[in-house]
Protein backbone atom coordinates (compact mmCIF):
# COMPACT_ATOMS: atom_id res chain seq x y z
CA UNK A 1 0.00 0.00 0.00
CA UNK A 2 1.30 3.41 -0.94
CA UNK A 3 0.19 6.66 0.68
CA UNK A 4 -2.20 7.48 -2.17
CA UNK A 5 -4.09 4.23 -1.56
CA UNK A 6 -4.79 4.74 2.13
CA UNK A 7 -8.19 6.36 1.65
CA UNK A 8 -9.32 3.62 -0.73
CA UNK A 9 -8.12 0.93 1.67
CA UNK A 10 -10.01 2.64 4.50
CA UNK A 11 -13.17 2.64 2.37
CA UNK A 12 -12.60 -1.05 1.62
CA UNK A 13 -12.25 -1.87 5.33
CA UNK A 14 -15.42 0.08 6.12
CA UNK A 15 -17.47 -1.44 3.28
CA UNK A 16 -16.40 -5.06 3.52
CA UNK A 17 -16.61 -5.24 7.32
CA UNK A 18 -20.08 -3.71 7.43
CA UNK A 19 -21.20 -5.97 4.56
CA UNK A 20 -20.19 -9.06 6.51
CA UNK A 21 -21.99 -7.94 9.66
CA UNK A 22 -25.17 -7.06 7.77
CA UNK A 23 -25.11 -10.31 5.77
CA UNK A 24 -24.95 -12.24 9.04
CA UNK A 25 -27.93 -10.53 10.64
CA UNK A 26 -25.95 -8.07 12.74
CA UNK A 27 -25.82 -4.30 12.90
CA UNK A 28 -23.13 -2.50 10.93
CA UNK A 29 -20.02 -2.23 13.10
CA UNK A 30 -18.94 1.13 11.63
CA UNK A 31 -21.68 3.69 12.26
CA UNK A 32 -19.97 6.72 10.76
CA UNK A 33 -18.42 7.61 7.38
CA UNK A 34 -15.73 5.48 5.68
CA UNK A 35 -13.10 7.94 6.88
CA UNK A 36 -13.49 6.38 10.34
CA UNK A 37 -11.59 3.32 9.12
CA UNK A 38 -8.61 5.44 8.08
CA UNK A 39 -7.36 4.94 11.64
CA UNK A 40 -6.34 1.37 10.73
CA UNK A 41 -4.05 2.63 7.99
CA UNK A 42 -2.63 5.38 10.18
CA UNK A 43 -1.87 3.22 13.21
CA UNK A 44 -0.55 0.22 11.28
CA UNK A 45 1.68 2.43 9.14
CA UNK A 46 2.95 4.11 12.32
CA UNK A 47 3.93 0.72 13.69
CA UNK A 48 5.05 -1.09 10.54
CA UNK A 49 5.57 1.18 7.52
CA UNK A 50 5.11 -0.60 4.22
CA UNK A 51 3.60 -3.74 5.74
CA UNK A 52 0.25 -3.75 3.97
CA UNK A 53 -0.36 -5.78 0.83
CA UNK A 54 -3.07 -4.76 -1.62
CA UNK A 55 -4.64 -6.62 -4.51
CA UNK A 56 -5.75 -4.38 -7.38
CA UNK A 57 -8.03 -5.16 -10.29
CA UNK A 58 -6.01 -5.08 -13.52
CA UNK A 59 -9.02 -3.77 -15.45
CA UNK A 60 -10.45 -1.04 -13.20
CA UNK A 61 -7.44 -0.32 -11.00
CA UNK A 62 -9.64 -0.64 -7.91
CA UNK A 63 -8.24 -2.00 -4.67
CA UNK A 64 -9.98 -5.37 -4.42
CA UNK A 65 -8.37 -6.57 -1.20
CA UNK A 66 -5.88 -5.63 1.48
CA UNK A 67 -4.08 -7.23 4.39
CA UNK A 68 -1.77 -5.76 7.02
CA UNK A 69 0.99 -7.78 8.65
CA UNK A 70 3.25 -7.08 11.61
CA UNK A 71 6.76 -8.58 11.81
CA UNK A 72 7.96 -9.09 15.36
CA UNK A 73 10.96 -10.76 17.00
CA UNK A 74 9.03 -13.95 17.80
CA UNK A 75 6.45 -14.10 15.00
CA UNK A 76 4.68 -12.36 12.14
CA UNK A 77 1.20 -11.25 13.13
CA UNK A 78 -1.57 -11.23 10.54
CA UNK A 79 -3.48 -7.97 10.74
CA UNK A 80 -6.89 -7.01 9.43
CA UNK A 81 -7.75 -8.57 6.05
CA UNK A 82 -10.53 -7.28 3.80
CA UNK A 83 -11.86 -8.14 0.35
CA UNK A 84 -14.42 -6.04 -1.50
CA UNK A 85 -17.81 -7.78 -1.87
CA UNK A 86 -17.50 -7.04 -5.60
CA UNK A 87 -14.52 -9.41 -5.77
CA UNK A 88 -15.62 -12.24 -3.47
CA UNK A 89 -14.86 -15.77 -4.60
CA UNK A 90 -11.82 -14.91 -6.71
CA UNK A 91 -9.15 -16.20 -4.33
CA UNK A 92 -7.93 -12.74 -3.30
CA UNK A 93 -7.80 -13.45 0.44
CA UNK A 94 -5.97 -16.73 -0.19
CA UNK A 95 -3.39 -14.99 -2.39
CA UNK A 96 -2.75 -12.25 0.19
CA UNK A 97 -2.42 -14.81 2.97
CA UNK A 98 -0.07 -16.99 0.93
CA UNK A 99 2.22 -14.03 0.32
CA UNK A 100 2.38 -13.14 4.02
CA UNK A 101 3.08 -16.76 4.96
CA UNK A 102 5.99 -16.67 2.51
CA UNK A 103 7.29 -13.45 4.12
CA UNK A 104 7.21 -15.19 7.51
CA UNK A 105 8.84 -18.34 6.15
CA UNK A 106 11.67 -16.27 4.70
CA UNK A 107 12.36 -15.06 8.26
CA UNK A 108 11.84 -18.53 9.79
CA UNK A 109 9.01 -17.15 11.92
CA UNK A 110 5.52 -18.52 12.64
CA UNK A 111 2.42 -16.59 11.59
CA UNK A 112 0.01 -15.65 14.38
CA UNK A 113 -3.53 -14.36 14.09
CA UNK A 114 -6.59 -13.71 16.20
CA UNK A 115 -9.80 -14.47 14.30
CA UNK A 116 -13.46 -14.40 15.22
CA UNK A 117 -14.99 -17.88 15.47
CA UNK A 118 -18.20 -16.33 14.12
CA UNK A 119 -16.61 -15.74 10.72
CA UNK A 120 -16.69 -19.25 9.27
CA UNK A 121 -15.44 -18.06 5.87
CA UNK A 122 -12.17 -16.75 7.27
CA UNK A 123 -11.85 -19.67 9.70
CA UNK A 124 -12.12 -22.07 6.78
CA UNK A 125 -9.54 -20.09 4.80
CA UNK A 126 -7.04 -20.13 7.64
CA UNK A 127 -7.58 -23.83 8.32
CA UNK A 128 -6.96 -24.73 4.67
CA UNK A 129 -3.75 -22.71 4.79
CA UNK A 130 -2.45 -24.75 7.72
CA UNK A 131 -3.47 -22.67 10.74
CA UNK A 132 -4.57 -24.47 13.91
CA UNK A 133 -6.48 -22.91 16.83
CA UNK A 134 -4.43 -23.02 20.04
CA UNK A 135 -6.32 -20.71 22.37
CA UNK A 136 -9.85 -19.33 22.70
CA UNK A 137 -10.78 -15.84 23.87
CA UNK A 138 -14.18 -14.55 24.95
CA UNK A 139 -15.61 -11.26 23.69
CA UNK A 140 -16.99 -9.07 26.45
CA UNK A 141 -19.46 -6.24 25.87
CA UNK A 142 -20.06 -3.76 28.68
CA UNK A 143 -22.73 -1.08 28.67
CA UNK A 144 -21.16 1.91 30.40
CA UNK A 145 -23.62 4.38 31.95
CA UNK A 146 -23.21 8.05 31.11
CA UNK A 147 -21.82 8.74 34.56
CA UNK A 148 -19.31 5.91 34.17
CA UNK A 149 -18.43 3.15 36.60
CA UNK A 150 -17.57 3.94 40.20
CA UNK A 151 -16.26 0.61 41.44
CA UNK A 152 -13.84 0.66 44.32
CA UNK A 153 -10.39 -0.75 43.62
CA UNK A 154 -8.93 -3.15 46.15
CA UNK A 155 -6.19 -1.68 48.28
CA UNK A 156 -4.15 -4.78 47.53
CA UNK A 157 -3.28 -3.49 44.06
CA UNK A 158 -1.80 -0.40 42.49
CA UNK A 159 -3.43 0.56 39.17
CA UNK A 160 -1.92 3.46 37.26
CA UNK A 161 -1.07 4.65 33.77
CA UNK A 162 1.73 2.68 32.15
CA UNK A 163 5.12 4.30 31.70
CA UNK A 164 7.95 3.45 29.34
CA UNK A 165 9.83 2.04 32.32
CA UNK A 166 7.11 -0.66 32.56
CA UNK A 167 7.68 -2.00 29.05
CA UNK A 168 10.42 -4.49 29.89
CA UNK A 169 8.27 -6.20 32.53
CA UNK A 170 5.21 -6.10 30.25
CA UNK A 171 7.19 -7.93 27.58
CA UNK A 172 8.35 -10.58 30.07
CA UNK A 173 4.79 -11.11 31.35
CA UNK A 174 3.26 -11.49 27.89
CA UNK A 175 6.01 -13.84 26.75
CA UNK A 176 5.41 -16.03 29.79
CA UNK A 177 1.67 -16.13 29.07
CA UNK A 178 1.55 -16.18 25.25
CA UNK A 179 5.09 -16.89 24.08
CA UNK A 180 5.37 -13.70 22.00
CA UNK A 181 7.19 -10.37 22.29
CA UNK A 182 5.68 -7.02 21.29
CA UNK A 183 7.86 -4.36 22.90
CA UNK A 184 7.43 -1.85 20.05
CA UNK A 185 3.64 -2.08 20.34
CA UNK A 186 3.68 -1.36 24.06
CA UNK A 187 6.02 1.60 23.57
CA UNK A 188 3.73 2.94 20.84
CA UNK A 189 0.63 2.72 23.05
CA UNK A 190 2.35 4.36 26.02
CA UNK A 191 3.92 7.18 23.99
CA UNK A 192 0.41 7.81 22.59
CA UNK A 193 1.41 10.37 19.99
CA UNK A 194 -2.06 10.19 18.39
CA UNK A 195 -3.77 10.87 21.72
CA UNK A 196 -6.15 7.90 21.46
CA UNK A 197 -4.55 5.21 23.64
CA UNK A 198 -4.88 4.50 27.33
CA UNK A 199 -2.59 1.87 28.86
CA UNK A 200 -2.84 0.79 32.49
CA UNK A 201 -0.71 -1.51 34.62
CA UNK A 202 -1.64 -3.38 37.77
CA UNK A 203 1.02 -4.10 40.38
CA UNK A 204 0.86 -5.98 43.65
CA UNK A 205 1.86 -4.52 46.99
CA UNK A 206 5.37 -5.90 46.48
CA UNK A 207 5.67 -4.10 43.12
CA UNK A 208 5.27 -7.20 40.95
CA UNK A 209 3.56 -6.55 37.62
CA UNK A 210 0.34 -8.57 37.66
CA UNK A 211 -1.26 -7.38 34.43
CA UNK A 212 -1.78 -4.58 31.96
CA UNK A 213 -4.59 -3.36 29.72
CA UNK A 214 -4.69 -1.15 26.66
CA UNK A 215 -7.72 0.62 25.19
CA UNK A 216 -8.42 2.95 22.29
CA UNK A 217 -10.86 5.88 22.23
CA UNK A 218 -11.64 6.96 18.67
Language model regions located:
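Short alpha-helical
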Residues: 4, 8, 73, 120-121, ...
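Amide-forming acyltransferase catalytic core, primarily the GNAT-like/NAT-type
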Residues: 9, 128-218
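Active-site rim helix/loop that mediates acceptor-substrate recognition in acyltransferases
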Residues: 10-59, 63, 176-199, 204
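Conserved beta-strand in the GNAT
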Residues: 52-54, 61-70, 77-82, 201, ...
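Active-site acidic-Proline motif in GNAT/NAT acetyltransferases
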Residues: 71, 84-86, 90, 118
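Conserved GNAT acetyl-CoA-binding A-motif
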Residues: 76-79, 104-118
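Conserved acetyl-CoA-binding loop-helix of GNAT-fold acetyltransferases
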Residues: 80-83, 89-104, 123-128
